[in-house]
Amino acid sequence: MTKKLINQFKSFQVHPYHLVEPSPWPLGASVACLILTLGGVMKFHGFAAGDIGLPLGLILVLASMLLWWRDVIREATYQGHHTKTVKYGITLGVVLFIVSEILLFFSLFWAFFHSSLAPSVELGSTWPPVGIEPLNPFEVPLLNTIILLTSGCTITVSHAKIISGDRGATILYLILTILLAWMFLGLQWVEYVNAPFTIADSVYGSTFFVATGFHGLHVMIGTIFLTVSLNRILSYHLTSGHHLGYEAAIWYWHVVDVIWLFLYVSVYYWGSNV
């Protein structure tokens, strides 16, 4: 009897950490990234193999991501591996990820102000450079600012509703946030298509399109995060006390909002010299 109890005790986990089972996805994702990189290099250098390697690598990377994250969802939702200790580690990882994103945009702002505060002679010693017609900050950029700030409000309401257990309102305000995000991206695309300058037009065009383009990319990533959260809410994966992934997506979205405010004030408003 004692031996049986000892064997049963050994089958229980006596620590709060998640010891991940062997998984093929780290190796699969590494190989997929290698194929994607090689395919991209061959494509850029005109090799015919790049026409196959680049899309194949992209498909394999996306497949590895989806299958890996599927397993993470299973471990958290169905197997109960995400204890308080595990969630603390995930939270710390998300915070460090967001800090790294902030530092990325810090470098982009540094490049912008380095070029604009003391314009070189080649630029005409003025900012915007001679020959550049900047965008009117009170047209599409201002509308996009209002849209993004509104999305920050709707996602905050959605977060409050999931905490209070109002599932219907949570879904409604989350859908509104996603729609506002797509409106922002659509208007950003219209702005790019109709811009009177290109990325090749001096350092002004370079800093403008790189900074706003990277922000647009992060809006797309945040929209994907929110869409996945919506799918998980519809699938009854998230509850009022268990929605760390959704909270992480909301933190990310608020950071994207704040970065846009800095972009609007510095690049669109101050940088246009209105």
Curated annotation (Swiss-Prot):
InterPro entries, per this entry?
Cyt_c/ubiquinol_Oxase_su3, Cyt_c_oxase_su3_dom, Cyt_c_oxidase-like_su3, Cyt_c_oxidase_su3-like_sf, Cyt_c_oxidase_su3_a-hlx
Topologically, how does it sit relative to the membrane?
A: Multi-pass membrane protein
Give one Pfam family, short name only: COX3
- Catalysed reaction, written as an equation: 4 Fe(II)-[cytochrome c] + O2 + 8 H(+)(in) = 4 Fe(III)-[cytochrome c] + 2 H2O + 4 H(+)(out)
GO CC terms:
mitochondrial inner membrane
An individual GO BP term: mitochondrial electron transport, cytochrome c to oxygen
One GO term in the molecular function aspect is: cytochrome-c oxidase activity
Quote the SUPFAM superfamilies the UniProt record gives: Cytochrome c oxidase subunit III-like
The protein's UniProt keywords, in alphabetical order, are: Membrane, Mitochondrion, Mitochondrion inner membrane, Translocase, Transmembrane, Transmembrane helix
Transmembrane portions of the chain: 22-42, 47-67, 93-113, 137-157, 170-190, 208-228, 248-268
Q: What is its EC number?
A: 7.1.1.9
Compartment list:
Mitochondrion inner membrane
Work out whether the entry's keyword set contains Magnesium. Answer: no
Per UniProt, the enzyme's principal EC class comes to: translocase
Q: What is stated as this protein's family in its record?
A: Belongs to the cytochrome c oxidase subunit 3 family.
PANTHER family on file: CYTOCHROME C OXIDASE SUBUNIT 3, CYTOCHROME C OXIDASE SUBUNIT III
The protein's role, per its UniProt record: Component of the cytochrome c oxidase, the last enzyme in the mitochondrial electron transport chain which drives oxidative phosphorylation. The respiratory chain contains 3 multisubunit complexes succinate dehydrogenase (complex II, CII), ubiquinol-cytochrome c oxidoreductase (cytochrome b-c1 complex, complex III, CIII) and cytochrome c oxidase (complex IV, CIV), that cooperate to transfer electrons derived from NADH and succinate to molecular oxygen, creating an electrochemical gradient over the inner membrane that drives transmembrane transport and the ATP synthase.
Q: How does it assemble?
A: Component of the cytochrome c oxidase (complex IV, CIV), a multisubunit enzyme composed of a catalytic core of 3 subunits and several supernumerary subunits. The complex exists as a monomer or a dimer and forms supercomplexes (SCs) in the inner mitochondrial membrane with ubiquinol-cytochrome c oxidoreductase (cytochrome b-c1 complex, complex III, CIII).
Annotated protein name in UniProt: Cytochrome c oxidase subunit 3
From which source organism is this entry?
Allomyces macrogynus
